[in-house]
Amino acid sequence: MQILLAALIAYLIGSVSFAVIVSAAMGLADPRSYGSKNPGATNVLRSGNKKAAILTLIGDAFKGWIAVWLARRYGLPDVAIAWVAIAVFIGHLYPVFFRFQGGKGVATAAGVLLAVHPVLGLATALTWLIIAFFFRYSSLAALVAAVFAPLFDVFLFGTNHNPIAWAVLAMSVLLVWRHRGNIAKLLAGEESRIGDKKKAAANGNAQDGGKA
């Protein structure tokens, strides 16, 4: 019962979509309506509003971190922490508060990994940053980081009696699956690079002919 309750709370935390909330608060269009239609920091960046993208990134990472941190704070066993990690991640992918239309989970997964162990989170985040810097593809960086995250975890903690390692692997598999459309675009040379503006995301209520 304790594990079920912890997982449910984690799922509800994960269901808070900061991309949608921040965009609405800052007078931007719903990120599910433009660009990749993904409610995540990279797509919010396509609105041209870097502040909104940064706030989205921080919020999505924080909810992953706080869910796992709370589980540890209250002394839950590793099995429960593993379920909490998966639940908060799934909450981001399929948020009950936003008609189950969620993001792809990169920032939330990063927050989870940082809470599991700072070295694990930083190593995975550094992998993302290196690939993103050289190739300018957020999706490619996410895919590479997803592949390396379970390897980093095994290297740091091994596999014996380590249910969290299975949670990390499950998140990586889900993250890759959520990027299946991006994989097709990467192979076809049609994937958008970081910073591309596919569509103006200013609120339609802007005055003077829609000037920003």
UniProtKB/Swiss-Prot annotation:
Known pathway: Lipid metabolism; phospholipid metabolism
State which Enzyme Commission number(s) the record gives: 2.3.1.275
Q: Which domain of life is it from?
A: Bacteria
> Which first-to-last residue range defines the signal peptide?
none
What is one Pfam family matched by this protein? G3P_acyltransf
> Which UniProt keywords are given for this protein, alphabetically ordered?
Cell inner membrane, Cell membrane, Lipid biosynthesis, Lipid metabolism, Membrane, Phospholipid biosynthesis, Phospholipid metabolism, Transferase, Transmembrane, Transmembrane helix
Q: How does it sit in the membrane?
A: Multi-pass membrane protein
Q: Where are the transmembrane segments?
A: 3-23, 51-71, 78-98, 115-135, 139-159
Entry keyword RNA-binding = no
Q: Which InterPro entries match?
A: G3P_acylTferase_PlsY
Q: Which GO terms describe its cellular component?
A: plasma membrane
Instruction: Name the reaction it catalyses.
Output: an acyl phosphate + sn-glycerol 3-phosphate = a 1-acyl-sn-glycero-3-phosphate + phosphate
Q: Name one GO biological process term.
A: phospholipid biosynthetic process
Cellular location(s): Cell inner membrane
The entry lists its GO molecular-function terms as: acyl-phosphate glycerol-3-phosphate acyltransferase activity
Query: Could you say which protein family the record assigns here?
Result: Belongs to the PlsY family.
Summarize the subunit comment. Probably interacts with PlsX.
User: What role does it play?
Assistant: Catalyzes the transfer of an acyl group from acyl-phosphate (acyl-PO(4)) to glycerol-3-phosphate (G3P) to form lysophosphatidic acid (LPA). This enzyme utilizes acyl-phosphate as fatty acyl donor, but not acyl-CoA or acyl-ACP.
**The protein's name in its UniProt record:** Glycerol-3-phosphate acyltransferase
What organism is the protein native to? Burkholderia multivorans (strain ATCC 17616 / 249)
- Gene for this protein? plsY
